[in-house]
Regions:
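Catalytic cores and adjacent flexible loops of soluble metabolic enzymes
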Residues: 1-211
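Metal-ion/cofactor- or nucleotide/acyl-coenzyme-handling active-site neighborhoods
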Residues: 208-404
Length: 404
C-alpha cells in the first residue's frame, strides 16, 4: 500500500511523477489521501481520473477520507459511481472511529453500496461491532466533526492546530479561526507545536501597566480573609460549609470565571474569552460587584471593572500557562495576600462531571487530565511557600496545603 499524505497538495505534474514511480514499484494499492478532510467532490474525481488513466491497471486505487468538513461520505459516493475497470478501495471505520474528526463510517458506505450499487454487505454485522466494542470505546475517547476541525480544514491546516486551541478551553470559535488564519502558509501542512504556542500567546498578549489596579485591589482585600470560588461540583456538595464560612468570617469573595447568585461575591475574576461571552449573553446581574479583567479581554462596557496585565500573571508552563485559578493567585500574591481560602477547586477527573453547572461545561482532553493536574499541583506547592493556601472543600490538588 502506498498512501501519499495530503494528496490535495500535489500539483498535477507532481502527482503524475509520483504515479510513474508507483508503476515501477508496483504496490498492491495506491491511494488518494484527504489528510485534512478538505477535498470536495470535483477535487477527488479530478485526481481519480488523472491517476486512473496513468497508473498500471493491476494496481488498486484507494481513497482514505477524513471527516473534518463532513465530506468523507459524499466523496466516497462520487468514487463509487465512477465507471472503471480498476478495483476501488474505500477505507472506513465503524461509527467513523478515528483521530480528531474521524473517518468514513462503515455503516453509511456499506448501506449506500447495498442500495445504490449492489447488495453485498451485511450491515447488521457492522451494528454488532458497534454494540460490542465501539460504544464502550466512544465513552472513553472523543472523535467526530467539531467546529474547530472544520475551521482547520477550511483553511487547509493540520487538524492538530485546532486540537491544541480546543484544549486551551479559553477561546471562542472566532478566536480559533483568527489564530489559524495567522499560521504562515509554509507551516500549515505539518504541525508545529512551538509555532501554535507562540501564536496563541501572541493572540492573548496585551501588556498594560496595572499598577493602579493592583493598588486598588490591595485596598479591597486589606484586613480581610480571601475566599476564591471555582466552579467545581463541591460548591454544591459542600455548599453549607462554604456558606457557614462566609457568614462566620466575612471574607472578600472572588468568583473565578463564573457567576452564581447562590454565593455573594465581592468580585468576579475573568480571564477567559469563552466565559466572558457566557457572562455577556446571560446579561448577569453584576451591578455593585467589582469585575477584575485580564488585559486579553476586550472592554465589555461594564461599570466598575479593573484591568490587570494578562502576561504578568501567566506562567512559563505552556500546558497551564493561563489557568485562571493560578493567574488569580499570582495577582493576589502581588497584592500582598498572605493566605487564601479555596472552594470548588476540585481538579479534573476522567469520566465525571467536573462542573457543578452544565452551562459551565467545557470538553476536557482526557489524555492530558492527569498531567495537567500534576502541573497545577506543583504550581500551588510553589505558591504555598509565600502564601498559605487553605482548601475549604475537597480537592485533587491538595498536597501539603492545609484543609479546613
Amino acid at each position: 500500500f502506498m498512501q501519499p499524505v495530503g494528496t490535495v497538495f500535489y500539483s498535477d505534474i507532481e502527482l503524475l511523477q509520483l504515479v510513474e514511480k508507483i508503476n515501477v514499484l508496483h504496490p498492491y494499492a495506491f491511494y488518494i489521501v484527504d489528510t485534512l478532510g478538505s477535498m470536495y467532490r470535483n477535487e477527488v474525481s479530478h485526481r481519480f481520473y488523472l491517476i486512473d488513466e496513468n497508473m498500471h491497471p493491476d494496481i488498486l486505487l484507494g481513497f482514505h477520507g477524513h471527516n473534518n468538513m463532513q465530506l468523507a461520505f459524499s466523496n466516497a459516493q462520487v468514487l463509487g459511481k465512477i465507471q472503471t475497470k480498476r478495483t476501488l478501495i474505500l477505507d472506513s471505520s465503524v461509527y467513523g472511529m478515528g483521530r480528531g474528526a474521524g473517518n468514513l463510517p462503515t455503516e453509511l458506505i456499506t448501506q449506500y453500496i447495498n442500495k445504490k450499487i449492489q447488495s453485498r454487505y451485511d450491515v447488521t454485522m457492522v451494528m454488532d461491532i458497534y454494540d460490542e466494542y465501539i460504544a464502550a470505546i466512544r465513552k472513553e475517547y472523543e472523535w467526530g466533526y467539531t467546529m474547530p476541525y472544520h475551521i482547520a480544514a477550511s483553511h487547509v491546516c493540520h487538524p492538530s492546530y485546532a486540537a491544541y486551541l480546543i484544549n486551551k478551553q479559553t477561546l471562542t470559535m472566532k478566536d480559533i479561526e483568527r489564530i489559524i488564519q495567522s499560521i504562515p502558509e509554509e507551516y500549515k501542512v505539518l504541525y508545529d507545536r512551538e509555532l501554535i504556542e507562540q501564536l496563541y500567546s501572541q493572540f492573548q498578549s496585551k501588556k498594560i501597566d496595572d499598577t493602579a489596579s493592583v493598588r486598588e485591589i490591595e485596598g479591597l482585600i486589606q484586613g480581610r480573609k480571601i475566599l476564591l470560588l471555582a466552579p467545581g461540583k463541591t460548591l454544591v456538595s459542600h455548599g453549607q460549609t462554604i456558606r457557614d464560612f462566609i457568614e462566620r468570617e466575612r471574607p472578600y469573595v472572588i468568583s473565578v470565571n463564573f457567576v452564581d447568585g447562590g454565593y455573594p461575591a465581592d468580585a468576579y475574576f475573568v480571564s477567559n474569552h469563552k466565559r466572558m461571552d457566557i457572562l455577556g449573553q446571560e446579561n448577569r446581574p453584576l451591578k455593585g460587584t467589582r469585575i477584575l479583567l485580564t488585559s486579553n479581554i476586550p472592554n465589555p462596557g461594564w461599570e466598575d471593572y479593573l484591568y490587570v496585565d494578562y502576561d504578568r500573571y501567566t506562567n512559563t508552563d505552556p500546558m497551564i500557562s493561563d489557568n485562571a485559578g493560578l493567574m488569580l493567585l499570582k495577582l493576589l500574591q502581588r497584592c500582598g495576600a498572605l493566605e487564601v481560602f479555596l472552594a470548588g477547586f476540585d481538579g479534573f477527573q476522567e469520566d465525571q462531571e467536573n462542573y457543578y453547572s452544565e452551562e459551565l461545561y467545557f470538553q476536557v482532553n482526557t489524555n492530558d487530565i492527569e498531567e495537567k493536574r500534576g502541573r497545577i499541583q506543583k504550581q500551588l506547592k510553589e505558591m504555598s511557600r509565600t502564601m498559605k493556601l487553605y482548601f475549604l472543600t475537597p480537592s485533587l490538588y491538595q498536597g501539603e496545603e492545609a484543609y479546613v
